[in-house]
Amino acid sequence: MDCGSVGGQRTQRLPGRQRLLFLPVGLSGRPGGSETSARRCLSALSDGLGALRPRAPAARGGVSRASPLLLLLLVPSPRLAAAAPRRQLGDWERSRLGYAAPPAGRSSAWRCSPGVAAAAGALPQYHGPAPALVSCRRELSLSAGSLQLERKRRDFTSSGSRKLYFDTHALVCLLEDNGFATQQAEIIVSALVKILEANMDIVYKDMVTKMQQEITFQQVMSQIANVKKDMIILEKSEFSALRAENEKIKLELHQLKQQVMDEVIKVRTDTKLDFNLEKSRVKELYSLNEKKLLELRTEIVALHAQQDRALTQTDRKIETEVAGLKTMLESHKLDNIKYLAGSIFTCLTVALGFYRLWI
């Protein structure tokens, strides 16, 4: 949760993101500094996590910066942030140490022990009328939802002991050397440990350990061995009967195949004989038809010869008759000419006789 201005107005939260803010604290754990230092701290907090400057001890005389890698590790993933409700850092630390929660909604700042103030990273307190600073302090309380993830039962641990993935004491010493208080360093390391444990829980939901893999592999191999034994037993008992039945069926199939082949050969021979008989019969019919055609041709030729003979005879008869008629006409013609000439001469003689008479 960030503070955008000294007036204490709440800025919008980024979805799925949680920021861990470290406030400057003195060596003795008592409120100290001036109002200008408080305002400088507030402006640095409003700029983001990169501008955090924890105050170093007075003997050092310098200001150290938090490591960017450490700040990146302290920002949990959106999936972890959505899994648990948000809770302020002061409430979480007070519930861990056994302190009661302060009353909410008051304008004045509440006081606690120096150790708790140093662990929570409290701002310097003022007893005067500073409602803007008090409201900003109330707005700058840390939401540590990812630190309150309930520890689930893990299958990958043989005992309920806590498993660490890095040297926490060395990290605490490093943070103390860089200007953080002891309780602040312990809180940061505990937050890192819990974040790593939560991430490992998420990883182990989808994965298994080497031991579990070996156990599962041995179980699968034992099941495969049992299946092999069952297969051998079945091969000796049931597979022998199945093989005998298969052999019997093969013999029956072979016999049926032989019978079918014999029937096919018989049918082929019968069809061949039928084809040959039909072929010979067709050939005989063809020869008979050829003979009949030859006889018909000879008869037709004889009829044509007879017809030609009859025609020649009729032609000759017609010619003889025509010649006889011609001779008869010629003879009648001569007779007619003779008769006409005789009649004409007779008429002339009569006419000459009458003419002589008249004359």
Swiss-Prot record:
Domain of life: Eukaryota
Keyword Iron: no
Subcellular location per the Swiss-Prot or TrEMBL entry: Mitochondrion inner membrane
Subunit annotation: Interacts (via coiled coil regions) with MCU; the interaction is direct. Interacts with SMDT1/EMRE; the interaction is direct. Interacts with PPIF.
Topology in the lipid bilayer: Multi-pass membrane protein
Transmembrane segments: 69-85, 339-358
Protein's UniProt name: Mitochondrial calcium uniporter regulator 1
Primary location recorded for the protein, binned into one broad class: mitochondrion
Topological domain spans for side Mitochondrial intermembrane: 1-68, 359
Keyword annotations: Calcium, Calcium transport, Coiled coil, Ion transport, Membrane, Mitochondrion, Mitochondrion inner membrane, Transmembrane, Transmembrane helix, Transport
Family as reported in the entry's similarity comment: Belongs to the CCDC90 family.
Stretches assigned to coiled coil: 235-310
Positions on the Mitochondrial matrix side per record topology: 86-338
Keyword Iron-sulfur: no
One biological process term in Gene Ontology: calcium ion import
Annotated function: Key regulator of mitochondrial calcium uniporter (MCU) required for calcium entry into mitochondrion. Plays a direct role in uniporter-mediated calcium uptake via a direct interaction with MCU. Probably involved in the assembly of the membrane components of the uniporter complex (uniplex).
One annotated Gene Ontology cellular component of this protein: mitochondrion
